[in-house]
Amino acid sequence: TVSIFGENGLSVSAALGRKAADFMETDLSPAPSCGRLFDMSAMGMLYRDELMRHVPYGVSDCAILSSDPMISAFINDCMRTTSNERALTLRINRRGTSLSAYTEKTGVVPFVKLIAICGMYELESGRDISVPYDSPAFLDDLARSYGRTAYRYLSAPSDGSDNVARRLAARQFWSRDALFTAAKLTCILEEKNMTFPELYSLLPPLFVYSTTAQLELPPDYLDEFEGENFSFGRDGANGFVLVEKRGKTHISPLGNGRFRLTAQSFDEETARELCAEAQAFISSGAK
């Protein structure tokens, strides 16, 4: 799988993605017909310099781990971690796209809640936030509670409808890059002079559960669905949303017959139940 990203690390338009895919499927050309070769190793230094601008000088009581030893060495070197006590452990996945936090008091805190913590800091500071289109709906509720807006950008836009969200996201690396999320989180802890459990306790209680499933019919088929005990309909360009008393479930088409279910509720068991019920509902074809 090849992922294509454009300016500021954001996903490219559907048209450009198709053009790049077509290019990669062409036959190999002899060396004389190729253009100039460029040494891209300097890109790593540019990334490092940008990350260094976002981290505090020396992070204490924090261990940052990754299943990729290169990521682990890189981020620890940039953030100059100084403690072996590991009051807070941050773990980055192999692709650098997700982050979790762990303390004895909080247990494991998933990436979406760390994004919410960073977003809450921005909102408290009087700034809007921008997140990927399939981010949980509670980020919109959180933004509204501060009188601000949570903009969303599409994964493969066909027009400029998400330009405002993309311009904002270009300055908020923490919303999509786990290394920058780790840096942002430690900066917030240092600025507020708080422990992670204290900071985490400020977040409104909410559990988010996400899974993917297969849909044999086109996504537009969901437009015809109706429910008796809940509301169901389109959520702008982001997919569909199913709302009932226990919580919300967002349904986002991913292409190739797959879709993502993201449920939010006040406890884990209910969120899992909402996902399972939504999957059964759309698979049944009931109207």
Whereabouts are the PLM-identified features?
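Residues on a specific face of well-ordered alpha-helices
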Residues: 14, 18, 22, 26, ...
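Conserved phosphate-donor
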Residues: 91
